[in-house]
């Protein structure tokens, strides 16, 4: 009797592994979380968060782009080697400050964010070298670009944080697939800005994407979809008042309430 039960029991236990059921997948992810160790900062980056008090002092958000231009210039004067704005500028500034902001962006390597929206519009694929077949990648349904005068003076990359099955973010795409090619992520564009290059290399295999590479830097291994597991790093932070940015690439975000959504991760909200 017991022998007759063994096979059905084994089949039942194996089914979640075969079909990757939700509980099994969550268990795998939680196990991964427990094994991940916090990494030491590279020393190359600093985060500058626009705070609630900054927004209040300037009468609301978004700031006029003349103000953003001044922030950019101040950062460069304090020794920043580049600036990444984790925000998009898809519409003209109602105060007419776009030309001033564009000029400030040209003073140092600068990166602007783009965001997904199902508009069926995509940036032109440029500076992309593919070794292998065009397979793998996460398709996007549309992207909102920055206005021409700003993107002509900067890099622009897509900022997206797709969640895993338990609604936590662990993997970030380093690029996304468009109908006519590829568009690099915000992080990939920062690497290009830091090295002063206009191109990157995608290497694929039979299963999908294998790695991406930016000249002068080691290749970055990805999963088949072009995603990189996040390495948790307690990156140094500064403020508009302190501006401790000498020798760093500055990534500008905001912690002010209601401006940008927070991202849930295994280590808390970002």
Regions found by a protein language model. Name each.
Residues 2-216, 245-270:
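Non-transmembrane functional regions of envelope-associated proteins
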Residues 1, 176, 229-233:
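Charged, glycine-rich intrinsically disordered N-terminal tails and low-complexity linkers that flank
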Residues 202-242:
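Substrate-access "cap/lid" subdomains that shape
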